[in-house]
Amino acid sequence: FVMLLGMGMTSCGDFLDKPVEDNYNTENYYNGDASCISGVNYLYSSPWYDFQRGFIKVGEVMSGNMYWGSSPYMNFSTNGTDEDLVNMSYSLWAEIGHCSTVYESLKNAINTSEKVKNQCMGECLAWKAMAYFYLVRTFGDVPIIHSNSESLGKGDYNSVSKVEKADVYEYIIMTLEKAMELLPKEKSTSGRIDYYCAEGLLSKVYLTKAGVSGSLNQDDLKKAAEYAKDVIENSGRGLMEHYEDIFRGSNQFCDEILIAWRWTVGTQWTSQNTLQSDLAPEGFDENGDCWGGWGGPSIDLMEAFGVSPKDDPANRVDPDHRRKATIMMPGDVYSYFWRDHDLPANAQKDGLKKGFSYLDFWYNKGYNAAATGQCQGPCGGSNVKHLYGDNYDHKEELGITPNHMSNALPTPLLRLSDIYLIYAEAQVQMGNNTDTLALDCFNKVRGRAYEWQGFVRKTSLT
C-alpha cells in the first residue's frame, strides 16, 4: 500500500522529465515531513471501509435505534459467518496491522522533523487504540498483536491466543498513553488527531472499562472524569451552536469533532464514504446508488425524541432539536439537502425557496419525477445522519463532486459533547450529583438540544 501511495504522489510532468521511480518501499518512502504525513493519511479511511456497514448494524440496529427488516441484527441471530460481521472483523484487524506497520516504519524516517515524526507516530497509535476499542466491545476477548514484524518473525500469527477483555482494555490504555506522549497539544486545522483527541478517547475507554467486571470500578470512573475534565478545560474547544451543523461537510474541521473518518473521492476504492447508499432512499441522489429507504429509525428512537409517527405534521411539536437532524418525518423540510431544487409553494417556510421536502419527495412528481407515491420509511421516518444530499449539495459543502457509491462526508466517531457527558456520567456514578462542572457540561449539551423550548437548567443530575 505504501508503494501505491508513493506512486500516487508522482505528477504527470515527472514522467516527461525522468524515468518512473516505482521502487518506493518502507526504507525510502518516509523521507521528509510531507511523506510522513501522507503515509499516515490513509489510516483515517481505507482500512476502515469494510467496517462501515457493521458500524451501522451493530451500533444502531442491535441497539434498537434502527429498523432493518429481516436482518439477523434485528433479532440477535447473527453468527460467525455473517458477511458484514466478518468484514467488520477483517477491517478492524487491517487497521491494526496498517497502524503497526506504519508506526514501525516511521521510526526510521529520514530528513524529518522530530515534531512531525512524533505526531504521525502518535496518530498511528491513536487509530490502533480506536480499532481495538471497537474490537473488544464487539467481539469480547481478542488476541493482541503488538508488532506485526515480531509476529511474522516468530511465525506465530496464526496461533496467537485470545486475551481477556480486561487485559485488552489495559492494552488500549497503554497505547493511548503512548500516543499522548507523542501527539501535539495544538489543535489541527485539518482534522488530524491531537493530544486532546486521544485523551478524550482515553476518557471514554476508562468509562467503558469501569463496568467490564460487572460492578463499577471507582478508580476507572475517577480516571474517566480526570481525563475528560482536562479535555474540557484545556483543549480550547467548544460545542457547535446548532446540533445539525456538526454533520455538514463544511464544518468537518469544527472544534466539536475530535476523531472522525476522513474520506476522499478518488480512483482508489475503499478511500470513500458509502454510508449514504445504505441509509438513503432510492432517488435521493442522482448517482443511482441509494437503496436504504426500507430501513430507518425505529419507533423507539422517535419516542425517545418525544415524537410519534402518528403525530399530525401540522401540529407536531418537537421538544428535542436533535430529532430533525436524526430522523426525517412528514412535514420536514431541509435547507441543506436538495438545495438546487425549487420547493413546492406549500413547503416554503421562513423564506426558504429551495431544499428537500420529505413528503413531496415521495408523493409529488412535479417536485421529484421519481416519486413513488409510497413512503418507504418503515416506521414513519427516514435517516438523516451520514447523508450529504445530491451532487450539488456535496459540491457546496465539500468543494468536489461525488461519484457512484463514493462521497467525502466525514464520519464523526468522537465529539466534544461525548466528553461532556462522559464527565457528567462518571461523576454521577461516583455519587457526585451536584458537581458544578458536571452540571455545566450536562446543561450545555441538553440546552442545545432543547434550545427552542426554553430549557431549564438542571441543578442535580439525579
Give names to the regions the model predicted:
Residues 9-11:
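C-terminal motif of bacterial Sec signal peptides marking the signal peptidase cleavage site
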